[in-house]
Amino acid sequence: ELSVAKLLEKLKVDDIKHQYYFYGDDTISVNKELYNFLETNVPYLISMVSSDFSKITLADIKEDNAEEEIIIPDPAHEPTIGVIDTLFDENVYFGNWVENVDYLDEIEKLMDKGKDRTHGTAISSIIVDGPRLNPWLDDGCGRFKVRHFGVCAERISTVKLMKKIKEIIANNSDIHVWNLSLGTDDEVSKNFISYDAAVLDELQAQKNIVFVISGTNDNRSTKNGILRVGSPADSLNSIVVNSVRRDGTPASYSRKGNILSFFNKPDVSYYGGDYNERIKVYTSNGEMNEYGTSFAAPWISRKLCYLIDVVGLPREVAKALIIDSAAGWEYKLGAYKNKDILGYGVIPIDISRILSSESREIRFIVYGTSQSYKTTNYAIPVPRDDENKYPYIARATMCYFPDCSRAQGVDYTNRELSMKFGRVKPNGQIDDINENIQDEEGLHADERQSRKEFRKWENTKFISKVLKANRPIVSYGERLWGISVISKERLSSQMEKDLNFGAVITLREVNGINRIEDFIKACTLRGWIVSEIDVENQIDVYNTNQEEIVFD
């Protein structure tokens, strides 16, 4: 098989006249003349075409002319969120909280000299001090430090942006959460993932990071139908955020998924304002009012960083908690009808609502590694009522970060983890709450059913069992409840590496009885070590770990 490099050499392409750049083994960036030459002589070579420019769309801005001096304490041990955006103005009141890097080459510095720094500064203002600017959006997460990489002033080519992001990630391994509020006006393809989204997915499969990406805006003056999202909002491993108004309805500029006609994007929604109810930000010009998905995403970056860096949860569990809190019990009851625009739903404002559960609920976290075909734990002692029945409705959310292959088109993800959760039947099989019959002997689910009903090949799984009559379900003798995670590889190669997954499971007592202590006791008797998440204690642990020890 002839490589692309050898083919270009064989075609006698003049690399001085026609400059081109390789990004991986099968992706090149070319100018228009070379593209036309290749299209004429080797049309089979061009299987996927990406738009060359990511245009950063700035929302309408309304000045607030606030002149009062704002006092902010110096940063201490707060965690750091990475921001990749337009340039940052170091002269704003929270400048000490931002480690700013103008990530520009010499030519870009000359071209961008004196350019506007509004957008990038506004994004970092939400991450650092968003609750002070918008008291009604106080999430209880406090302030965050920012490492801000200004990669452009207004426009940047997709391949150049991704090259910069690769370098930035490689040199800043201490940061786990990255905010990317940039995107294209062009709709993503129905047939393949965009180049920039594929790069972000690859980075997240390889490294312990999560990108939070804005769902992009519809900036047309006349809207004829709803546009699909622009890249890189088709990134599968990232958390893609769309925007809603204060009442939870989609913003007027909302764009939609799904991706490749299947994958659920956006993931979630949050408050990003609208033309007549804007979000307060701070820029070089003082306080301003803006709207857009760009200003919804940073709030989710705050929550995600809090869960990972302060509470100490793995990224897979943190993402599952975010998704689960958005879906709640309402998703299966009808909210799923708006999934193309709202994703799994609107995330609660207060972080405590993500980390806590109601008194009648039992919620627990499972974090594990898929090392083989099946990863199973059957010993989950769910409490029964006086009639020896299980008086619960249940839901579960699982997230993982698989390797992906853009060249496979719609068959994008390489690895599938299928989850079952429910009562263990006498034959040892799990009576799954989602009636998942995949991989059961004697039963068959075709590919269409597996994708539609069980979300096969999707890296976020949400399953729920809601009993309309709220009747308790029978127990199978002394059997317990179980979790089964089954791994499948799309490609013919064997599974070469372990894949971490995080699951959040919630049981709600239909009669409103608090059975959490019974659950903890039963788990302890079976040898489980049960650790309740104490947020205040985790904050103390985090602060202690950040203290510097000076040896005499």
What are these regions (language model features)?
Residues 87-95, 228-305:
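Extracellular S/T/G-rich loop segment that most often corresponds to the catalytic His/Ser-adjacent loop
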Residues 355-367, 428-475, 489-494:
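Extended, solvent-exposed segments with strong compositional bias
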Residues 1-11, 393-456:
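Extended low-complexity, serine/threonine- and proline-enriched intrinsically disordered segments
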Residues 1-73:
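Autoinhibitory propeptides
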Residues 412-426, 472-473, 477-552:
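C-terminal edge strands of extracellular/lumenal beta-sandwich accessory domains
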Residues 70-102, 110-159, 206-208, 235-237, ...:
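Subtilisin-like serine protease catalytic core
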Residues 151-231, 290-291, 295-296:
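Substrate-binding/access-modulating region of protease and related hydrolase catalytic domains
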Residues 311-391:
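C-terminal subdomain of the subtilisin-like protease fold in secreted/lumenal serine endopeptidases
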